[in-house]
């Protein structure tokens, strides 16, 4: 379990919701649901598990969660997220079982079935449902309301369900194809949330039975109406109107804004987008700016509807998204609850960010202090680190990065072209760079670092110490970071004489040094590539009479590459103020060089 997970586990809420485990590449590998997110997610990292779960846990590098209002919503959200992301461990841990669907068969006399396999057989499938219990509950209700075929009897032989009015799949009923098509449409509407027609029919039948003094039959219809009402509540996913909509919520704190967008498609929450950023103006105005940018992104297709929080100006949003999208600012009811849910998740995400940030700051500060203690020096608040880069002595450069309070200060980074060294001499290059940097620090009265770290071994460190002490009369601690044969941070060298400082590989101090070494190496090698590319460019332009340094610079600035120059015309080059004769000579030379 890494430190990120440790910190996130401490911040989990006790609400119901869904959690998404991710691997080191950011891929969602498992989606789960929980009545209590805190207890459920923590359980993965405590105690022993079976082999399958141990394999899952071994791949978890991070996790996210979505808070829901109820366990039922968590159940149904889990299904949608699994369908959308297809996490590999959901398939493994459920032993190949898929979620249940309700099916209407394509037969002369259609049947209602529960199945876990969706086939291209002309049947109609509804679902998926969270479990077999939920699917069975719905099917039982459908069986009581709709007289589909329920038996295996031949059509000319009536069954028990015929006698209680729940099956009309018999020749004696004289049903037509149009009748069954109408029945199928009624079921489709019912399962898609449009149940008003059925409820009204049941109410009418209840009244008829009551008027005929058939009170037991009237009570049966009353119970059916109550069952439909209960089912409507329990099976709410997001909305049962199958509409596509985006639901926005946002939260601000400490100069930061978090915006959460729930993507609802076909009535199901399939995905969310989370963005956190500093805001500088009025919160509502910055939210509107974000919305405008959101739909300029080609990945975000505009839905039919958008729900926004109550404090956002509706007309402004309508102007941003255009007439083809309906914008709603819900004031009450289920739609308002959905906006509240998005806002609640925005608050949870932003609060978690601050909590993690505070822990990270405290952790980094502790690492800096401990590093100073281990080295026997004052806390190294400012660290300057150096690395050289060259290929067989060509285009030699050096680079310096600065870390303050454990974080990179990129404004303070510096690049150096080696001026006095010929050939591949790493020690001489380090001597030149240390001399140039700290002569300027001394001359201009700049604040010296608390620690200098050289990306190198004993030789480079001793060279740096010699320049500081014997040439510049400066007393600044110098340490070296040696790499192993795999080019990985291996050990810290420090002291007089130099010795290896014992740092546990899993310590925060080691991680800090590793980040510094990676950063200075990245910065140096990037600079070296830039210089080498420029030098290569210039060398191909050598030997053309009338093409001096300034004109070469113009060509480099405007054409960017040799290929672009080769493809240019004489007129293109003349446009830069280069004479026609020189332009033609250049193109002739490049043409010869390419053959």
Swiss-Prot record:
InterPro entries documented for this protein: GIY-YIG_endonuc, GIY-YIG_endonuc_sf, GIY-YIG_UvrC_Cho, RuvA_2-like, UVR_dom, UVR_dom_sf, UvrABC_protein_C, UvrC
Keyword field contains DNA repair: yes
Family per record: Belongs to the UvrC family.
One GO CC annotation: excinuclease repair complex
Upper taxonomic lineage: Bacteria, Bacillati, Bacillota, Bacilli, Lactobacillales
One Pfam family this sequence matches: UvrC_RNaseH_dom
NCBIfam families the record matches: uvrC (TIGR00194)
GO BP terms in the entry: nucleotide-excision repair; SOS response
Name of the protein: UvrABC system protein C
Keywords of the record: Cytoplasm, DNA damage, DNA excision, DNA repair, Excision nuclease, SOS response
Subunit structure: Interacts with UvrB in an incision complex.
Record-level Gene Ontology MF annotations: DNA binding; excinuclease ABC activity
Biological role: The UvrABC repair system catalyzes the recognition and processing of DNA lesions. UvrC both incises the 5' and 3' sides of the lesion. The N-terminal half is responsible for the 3' incision and the C-terminal half is responsible for the 5' incision.
Residue ranges of every copy of the UVR domain listed in the record: 196-231
Coiled coil start-end: none
């Amino acid at each position: 379990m890494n430190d990120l997970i440790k910190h996130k586990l401490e911040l989990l809420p006790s609400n119901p919701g869904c959690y998404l485990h991710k691997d080191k590449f950011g891929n969602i590998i498992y989606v789960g649901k929980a009545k209590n997110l805190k207890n459920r997610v923590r359980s993965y990292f405590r105690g022993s598990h079976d082999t399958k779960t141990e394999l899952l846990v071994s791949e978890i590098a991070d996790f996210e969660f979505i808070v829901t209002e109820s366990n039922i919503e968590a159940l149904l959200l889990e299904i949608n997220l699994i369908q959308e992301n297809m996490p590999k461990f959901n398939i493994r841990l459920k032993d190949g079982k898929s979620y249940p669907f309700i099916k209407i068969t394509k037969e002369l006399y259609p049947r209602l079935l529960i199945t876990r396999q969706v086939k291209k057989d002309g049947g109609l499938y509804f679902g998926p449902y969270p479990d077999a219990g939920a699917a069975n509950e719905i099917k039982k209700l459908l069986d009581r309301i709709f007289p589909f075929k329920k038996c295996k009897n031949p059509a000319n032989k009536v069954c028990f369900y015929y006698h209680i009015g729940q099956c009309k799949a018999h020749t004696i009923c004289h049903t037509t194809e149009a009748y069954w098509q109408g029945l199928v449409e009624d079921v489709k509407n019912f399962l898609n949330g449009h149940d008003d027609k059925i409820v009204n029919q049941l109410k009418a039948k209840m009244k008829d039975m009551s008027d005929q003094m058939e009170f037991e039959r009237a009570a049966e219809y009353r119970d059916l109406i109550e069952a439909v009402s209960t089912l409507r509540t329990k099976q709410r996913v997001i909305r049962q109107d199958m509409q596509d909509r985006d639901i926005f919520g946002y939260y601000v704190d400490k100069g930061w804004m978090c915006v959460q967008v729930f993507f609802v498609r076909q009535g199901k929450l399939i995905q969310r987008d989370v963005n956190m950023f500093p805001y500088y103006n009025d919160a509502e105005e910055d939210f509107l700016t974000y919305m405008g940018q959101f739909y300029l992104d080609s990945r975000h297709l505009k839905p039919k509807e958008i729900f926004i929080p109550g404090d956002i100006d509706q007309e402004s949003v309508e102007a941003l998204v255009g007439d083809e999208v309906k914008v709603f600012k819900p004031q009450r009811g289920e739609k308002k609850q959905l906006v509240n849910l998005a806002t609640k998740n925005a608050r949870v995400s932003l609060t978690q960010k601050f909590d993690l940030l505070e822990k990270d700051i405290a952790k980094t500060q502790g690492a800096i202090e401990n590093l100073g203690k281990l080295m026997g020096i004052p806390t190294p608040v400012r660290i300057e680190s150096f690395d050289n880069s060259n290929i067989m002595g060509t285009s030699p450069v050096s680079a310096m990065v600065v870390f303050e309070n454990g974080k990179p200060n990129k404004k303070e980074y510096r690049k150096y072209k080696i001026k006095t060294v010929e050939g591949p001499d790493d020690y001489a290059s380090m001597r030149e760079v240390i001399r140039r940097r700290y002569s300027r620090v001394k001359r201009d009265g700049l604040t010296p670092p608390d620690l200098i770290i050289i990306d190198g071994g004993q030789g480079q460190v001793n060279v740096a110490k010699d320049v500081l002490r014997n040439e510049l009369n400066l007393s600044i601690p110098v340490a070296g970071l040696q790499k192993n044969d795999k080019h990985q941070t291996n050990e810290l060298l420090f002291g007089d004489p130099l010795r290896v400082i014992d740092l546990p590989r899993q310590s925060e101090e080691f991680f800090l040094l590793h980040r510094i070494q990676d950063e200075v190496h990245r910065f140096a090698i990037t600079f070296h590539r830039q210089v080498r590319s420029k030098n290569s460019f210039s060398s191909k332009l050598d030997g053309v009479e009338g093409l001096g340094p300034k004109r070469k610079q113009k060509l480099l600035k405007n054409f960017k590459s040799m290929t672009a120059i080769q493809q240019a015309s004489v007129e293109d080059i003349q446009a830069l103020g280069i004479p026609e004769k020189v332009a033609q000579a250049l193109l002739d030379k490049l043409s010869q060089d390419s053959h």
